[in-house]
């Protein structure tokens, strides 16, 4: 267990059609509890990677900045991931991230503006997410380790490669692909997703063949449960779980089953790992069969894409090692 996930808030200023997270009725994690989570992760479990999730983490900017600054005191915190829809980013935040040595900034942007706006709808007077993020792209170019997450729901599966190319054309080159999990997919949409991934594969291979940079995070991540993360998960109420499956509104009743402790009563590493091993069984039992089978099907397509890219990635890595200026 080498990952700490702090769910700092469930609040969000977007209502994405495909997002399962419950947005209302929950507290946000206090800065004190966020720091306690970091201390516990390092002192009891040895540290590793820290991830800040929501909701939208930048809805509680003082917690995010404070806990990131707190993490700097620990050499055993190797990377700090901030996942955001981008609406909270401004010049001040980008300057902070530009000088934060451990940061990986992950921004959700699904492709062309029409698809982004169809599925990622602002609420509460929030601006358009596409316009806001694209308006920052020149400033983002000087922020180290910016990753774009492209979510692909069923209705855009046929345009997955087109949307990916659009993001590349905007100047981004680090990506994370996220097919729509825990929603039903018709078989023809899964076929379209496969074709879309084939198109993305061709774009990636073409860039590598030309010596151009392109990083796909999916090549380096392996989770036992599709979409959801495992590790030491501190929820907004300071309870501790081995997975963040309880973020989903349709799965929140599993929180009682996945809870292994709290910041006041922390679990052992063994307790977290034992409970983590049961998550897929809980999901299969809880979810409608069509939804679970759809999730496995789209995850298999993503796995197929990654496996098809590994040989070329090895060759590209060898080339970059010969030319250090190309290293990501």
Segments the model singles out, each with a brief description of its role:
Residues 25-29, 56, 124-125:
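Pocket-edge positions in alpha/beta enzyme catalytic cores
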Residues 247-328:
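Flexible mid-to-C-terminal extensions adjoining Fe-S/redox cofactors in radical SAM and related proteins
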Residues 23, 54, 179:
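Residues that line or immediately flank small-molecule/substrate-binding pockets and catalytic motifs
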Residues 2-32, 44:
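Canonical Radical SAM [4Fe-4S] cluster-binding loop centered on the CxxxCxxC motif
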Residues 16, 61, 242-244:
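Activation segment
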């Amino acid at each position: 267990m080498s990952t700490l996930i702090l769910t700092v808030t469930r609040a969000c200023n977007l209502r994405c059609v495909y997002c399962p997270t419950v947005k209302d009725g929950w507290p946000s994690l206090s800065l004190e509890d966020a720091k306690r989570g970091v201390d516990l992760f390092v002192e009891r479990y040895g540290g590793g990677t820290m991830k800040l999730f929501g909701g939208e983490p930048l809805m509680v900017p003082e917690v995010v900045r404070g806990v990131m600054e707190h993490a700097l005191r620990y050499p055993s915190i190797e990377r700090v991931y901030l996942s955001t829809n981008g609406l909270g980013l401004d010049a001040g935040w980008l300057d902070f991230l530009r000088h934060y040595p451990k940061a990986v900034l992950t921004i959700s942007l699904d492709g062309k503006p029409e698809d982004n706006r169809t599925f990622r709808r602002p609420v509460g007077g929030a601006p358009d997410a596409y316009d806001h993020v694209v308006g920052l792209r020149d400033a983002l170019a000087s922020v180290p380790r910016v990753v774009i997450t492209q979510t692909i729901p069923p209705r855009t599966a046929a345009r997955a490669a087109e949307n990916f190319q659009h993001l590349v054309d905007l100047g981004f080159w680090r990506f994370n692909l996220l097919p729509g999990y825990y929603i039903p997919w018709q078989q023809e949409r899964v076929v379209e997703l496969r074709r879309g991934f084939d198109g993305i594969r061709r774009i990636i291979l073409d860039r590598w063949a030309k010596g151009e940079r392109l990083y796909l995070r999916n090549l380096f991540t392996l989770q036992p449960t599709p979409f959801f993360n495992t590790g030491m998960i501190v929820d907004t109420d300071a309870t501790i779980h081995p997975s963040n499956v309880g973020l989903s509104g349709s799965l929140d009743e599993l929180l009682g089953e996945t809870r292994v402790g709290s910041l006041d009563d922390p679990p052992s590493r063994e307790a977290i790992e034992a409970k983590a091993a049961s998550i897929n069984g809980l999901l299969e039992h809880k979810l409608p069969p069509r939804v679970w089978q759809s999730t496995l099907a789209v995850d298999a397509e993503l796995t197929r894409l990654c496996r098809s890219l590994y040989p070329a990635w090895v060759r590209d890595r060898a080339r970059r090692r010969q030319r250090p200026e190309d290293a990501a």
